[in-house]
Amino acid sequence: APYVGMSLYTWTAIIAVVLAGLSVGHWIGGILAPPHVKVRTGLTRAGWALAASAVSTLAILILLRFVASLLMPSSLNPISVIVILSTALFFLPSFFVGIVSPILTKLAVDEDKGRHPGKIIGRMYALGTLGSIAGTLLAGFIFISWIGSVGTVLLVSAVYSALAISFFLIGSVRSTTSYLVLLFLMLSGTSMLGAKLQAFTSPCHIESDYFCIRIDEAPSFAPTARLMALDHLVHSINDSVEPSLFYSPYIHFVDEYTKQRMGNDPPSTYFIGGGGFSLPRAWVHEYKGTANLIAVEIDPAVTKAAI
């Protein structure tokens, strides 16, 4: 959101890239699950796929800063930037996690001794879909609100790591220790690089259910100017000392037009959307509380940040 915003193009690109990664992963997973594959071999391969998923998911936070810094100043159109950024971030994690399902499905069919392959395959499809639904609902309604998008990515990486470890423990008796050490080194190296680049710090000052909110100084306007950015766009610019000083021409126009129409009478106004509350704040100051002003903002975090 802080880089390309949240739009139909953003979600379309992300969904398409994730589905593409899963599709290629399913194909490769089928190749890694031939008829002669043994249970321990299959579980070990699934474990490595999950380990790669954990590392590539953790790397999302690093790649986001790096790739975005290259794409944003470029002359590419916004849709191209969104597609390239989505591919760089989400293809590999989706690809690696897509490998797991065909392998486990093959092992489940073998364990059933081929008596009900259709039932087993249908069950695996159903469980995979239910897992996708559960992950979507938990991320959208709980985890992003609770621990933010960065915390959610770290949590997903931790879950993949835990699953990889469990598959290593079950599938690889002799090589378990070396596998675990290698996984630890991969995760540690990625984590150290991310910490050095401050990739695990959220770019948002406040991450609400609706927006990535940032409050920054705007010295190019005035030493006392402050701006509010919602996602990737500057929403409002206010002066922390003089409420009646407008930096946005359209707000200045509304203020002057209202005074010409209303004269010296205090306005009675209903604001749909508060944002930085530039005009309500100015009119409260100018009319000394005599104006009848109602401002409605859907996001309480935006209101709190503005105040």
Describe every region a protein language model picked out.
Residues 18, 241-245, 270:
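Charge-dense, low-complexity intrinsically disordered segments
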Residues 239-254:
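Conserved SAM-binding loop and adjacent beta-strand
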Residues 1-207, 214-225, 230-237, 255, ...:
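Alpha-helical transmembrane segments of multi-pass membrane proteins
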